[in-house]
Amino acid sequence: MARGPRYKVPKRRRREGKTNYYKRYKMVLSGHPRFVVRKTLKHIIVQIVTAKPEGDITIAAAHSRELYKKYGWMGGLGNTPAAYLTGLLAALRGLKAGIKYAVPDIGLHVPTRGAKVFAAIKAANDVGLKVPVGEEVVPSDDRIRGEHIASWAKMLQEASPEAYERFFSKYISRGFDPTQLPTHFEEVKNRILEEYKDVLGE
């Protein structure tokens, strides 16, 4: 509802909580591609996008569903390890397309210390695609590997098997032991790096 004669109705996408136009304007002015990280309730989506007068052009992209379908990932598709692996995949595709630098775009996500969006950005930097980010907000290596998930699973196995089966039903249905997530993370990460070893010059 309007609040007076000088009230200005926000743009539709701002009203819907989809776009911060001021931040977008600043990123477009930089002249660099954007490393776009978005999370839904179940998935992580990462894109490298460049702005053109006719609209945004996606240079490279990755969806966490690919981790399960193509690389055998048995963990959750919306957690911190999945965010890192999805960011890794998008970054490698960006490098293959010739992108060396991008500005971070986390949309309207609140920049919380250790957030999943920063795990994806860390992955890009780890393989040589420069995306500025403060070290203080990046999740720890233990968290990126899923050590916290494995520890919680082990605790539930011993303290409450019923709760364990409820919380980790997806893992169990795939025949995967969540306490082995850190080891599994390294295996899937290496599969992705092996596929793009030509990009990394290995």
UniProtKB/Swiss-Prot annotation:
One of its GO terms (cellular component) is cytosolic large ribosomal subunit. Keywords: Ribonucleoprotein, Ribosomal protein, RNA-binding, rRNA-binding. Disulfide bonds: none annotated. GO terms for biological process: ribosomal large subunit assembly; translation. InterPro entries: Rbsml_uL18_euk (IPR005485). GO terms for molecular function: 5S rRNA binding; structural constituent of ribosome. The keyword Ribosomal protein applies. Belongs to the universal ribosomal protein uL18 family. PANTHER family: LARGE RIBOSOMAL SUBUNIT PROTEIN UL18 (PTHR23410:SF12), RIBOSOMAL PROTEIN L5-RELATED (PTHR23410). Part of the 50S ribosomal subunit. Contacts the 5S and 23S rRNAs. This is one of the proteins that bind and probably mediate the attachment of the 5S RNA into the large ribosomal subunit, where it forms part of the central protuberance. This is Large ribosomal subunit protein uL18. It comes from Staphylothermus marinus (strain ATCC 43588 / DSM 3639 / JCM 9404 / F1). The lineage of its organism: Archaea, Thermoproteota, Thermoprotei, Desulfurococcales, Desulfurococcaceae. The gene is rpl18.
